[in-house]
Amino acid sequence: PPASLVLLILLGGLSVSAAGCIANDLWDRRFDREVARTRERPLAQGMIPLQATFVALVLLLLLSLLVVLALPDRHRLTCLGLALLALPPILLYPSAKRWFAYPQMVLALCWGFAVLIPWAATGAPLVGSITLVGCWLATLLWTFGFDTVYAMADRTDDARLGLRSSALSLGPHCVIAVRCCYALAALSLAFAAWGAGLAAGFWLCWFVAAIGMERSTKGLRSTQPQPMAIYGTHFRHQVWLGSLL
């Protein structure tokens, strides 16, 4: 794709991600005060006025809409439809921990649109592509896996506050579930790369990333509390591995 399209996709992805983070902190500001990992967040501390936060959220959503409207004419309507479908789960995800045992599934669905919208923007069909299906599944599985690890950091506080998460729901099977997600994500990416006919250079990166994903779970414990830094390090490893791919 042309560089201009790549830049638009990056801008749209960053603006939507930022909007989702703001929505999350708005929903959870009262709970965040009671959770060790999040109690220092600006909204939890009351350091930012709510009005300013809502203004920032609206501006970021408008920027995201402008990005969609700036996409190529032939594919704009499809991308707009996908963006509108993505909006409800993005805004509702923070509430999912109140009513759904696996809120990380909702987050995974949100990130799945980060595959579908750029794909549609290039004019590629949304049906019948092994590469698209592989990338989409890998994104869902990887997101569910790493956000489950993130939720492991909050298990004690979440249980006390009556909140739900996949880390709590999976209990002693938590780490094995994360490993399975990572293995299936790597396999899905392999199918996607095979369908796209990628060169040997990618497969070297894929191998390093696949091994790295599994190795990053070695120090995790399904039920025993661990230092917060362990979960943060795991999350940063996923960022680097994703960048490699």
Protein language model regions, located:
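Multi-pass membrane catalytic core of lipid/isoprenoid biosynthesis enzymes
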Residues: 3-13, 29-83, 160-199
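Residue-level recognition of pore/gate-forming positions within transmembrane alpha-helices
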Residues: 13, 61, 87-90, 111-112, ...
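Active-site alpha-helical segments that house and flank conserved acidic catalytic motifs
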Residues: 13-26, 138-152
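Alpha-helical transmembrane segments of multipass membrane proteins
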Residues: 16, 20, 64, 114-115, ...
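Interhelical loop and helix-boundary elements at the membrane-water interface
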Residues: 26, 30-56, 90-110, 155-180, ...
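Terminal RNA-binding accessory module
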Residues: 204-213
